[in-house]
């Protein structure tokens, strides 16, 4: 009207805990990705919502970890130079953190959550006792996922605060696996972080 664009509200009928917009399907427009925690009525899920040119609404969904009671961050980021996803860091019922990655798989034409799908007896490979969250550690545009393990404890230092080894990983959709980009020691108690050379892996500890 008079050369001005009008904004129109479209009711998608979706309820959600968190929402991110992005170009997930490799087209010329953005879609909506919603993430929902478990409620008495619905299980935890992620949904990719699209709105067509005629304002019709369609969606596809994928299961998420029902043990997560709070989302810490839901970040739009690149899995690779061509794939966009949402990196979801959450807190579980045991106060651990974990990460799930939601993305539209161009080959299968489905919304996927591969880390949750490969969970071992309900435990995700990204579950950790530290509060580290996903980030692009080297500013190359591709997000890294923290995979954390506690370092071994020497017998005479059982009561000491042992550090955690954090492997920053990229998710490889082609191989359906995580690839380690770098490994660091993070000790929140003493406030330090150290890069670890490959030859040290499995041969050291730190406090």
Q: Which ranges hold each PLM region?
A:
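Beta-propeller-forming repeat regions
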Residues: 1-207
């Amino acid at each position: 009207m008079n050369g001005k664009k009008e904004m129109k509200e479209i009711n998608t009928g979706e309820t959600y805990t968190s929402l991110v917009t992005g170009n997930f399907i490799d087209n010329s427009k953005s879609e909506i990705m919603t993430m929902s925690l478990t409620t008495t009525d619905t299980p935890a899920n992620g949904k990719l919502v699209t709105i067509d040119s005629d304002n019709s609404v369609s969606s596809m969904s994928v299961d998420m970890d029902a043990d997560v009671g709070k989302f810490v961050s839901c970040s739009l980021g690149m899995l690779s130079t061509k794939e966009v996803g949402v990196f979801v860091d959450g807190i579980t019922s045991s106060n651990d953190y974990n990460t799930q990655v939601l993305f539209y798989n161009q080959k299968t034409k489905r919304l996927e959550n591969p880390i949750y799908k490969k969970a071992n007896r309900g435990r995700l490979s990204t579950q950790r006792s530290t509060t580290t969250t996903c980030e692009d550690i080297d500013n190359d545009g591709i997000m890294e996922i923290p995979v954390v393990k506690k370092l071994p404890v020497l017998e005479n230092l059982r009561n000491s605060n042992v550090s955690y080894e954090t492997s920053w990983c990229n998710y490889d959709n082609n191989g359906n696996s995580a690839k380690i980009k770098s490994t660091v020691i993070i000790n929140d108690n003493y406030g330090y972080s150290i890069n670890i050379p490959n030859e040290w892996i499995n041969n050291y500890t730190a406090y």
